[in-house]
């Protein structure tokens, strides 16, 4: 079982390494205990898929930081406080909160939001 940065190293700037190390180690230890008790453990489903979903979500945000997407969102003319809260929640490590649309739809949500901001700001300039 790989845990922490061995699972996936994303970026040296963000603090995701500590969060992923903690969550992956905690989950792995629970699954090892189950396995030692001869209980069934599906490592792909119970561990890999769960951790992978969190890593994929956070990777979207690391990429968005470096390509300017997050800057465009945070410094738009009329930032929506609720959207900023939802995005900051992801950056704080809540990458498994499926109630948050910026987790659930992370692969497309940020790009849609930037397009909406661009259109809104173009229309407001008329």
Q: What are the functions of these language-model segments?
A:
Residues 3-6, 22, 29, 44, ...:
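A general structural signal for well-ordered alpha-helical packing
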Residues 1-13:
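Short FAD-binding loop at a beta-strand-to-alpha-helix junction that anchors the flavin cofactor
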Residues 10-29:
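A conserved FAD-binding loop/helix module that cradles the flavin
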Residues 30-126:
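C-terminal helical "tail/cap" subdomain of flavin- and related membrane-associated enzymes
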């Amino acid at each position: 079982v790989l845990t922490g940065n061995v699972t996936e190293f994303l970026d040296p700037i963000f603090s995701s390494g500590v969060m992923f190390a903690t969550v992956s180690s905690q989950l792995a230890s629970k699954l090892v205990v189950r396995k030692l008790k001869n209980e069934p453990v599906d490592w792909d489903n119970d561990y890999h898929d769960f951790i992978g979903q969190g890593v994929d979500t956070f990777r979207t945000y690391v990429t968005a930081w470096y390509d300017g997407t997050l800057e465009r969102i945070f410094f738009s003319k009329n930032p929506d406080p609720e959207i900023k809260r939802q995005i900051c929640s992801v950056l704080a490590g809540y990458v498994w909160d499926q109630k948050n649309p910026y987790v659930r739809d992370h692969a497309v949500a940020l790009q849609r939001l930037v397009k909406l901001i661009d259109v809104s700001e173009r229309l407001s300039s008329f």
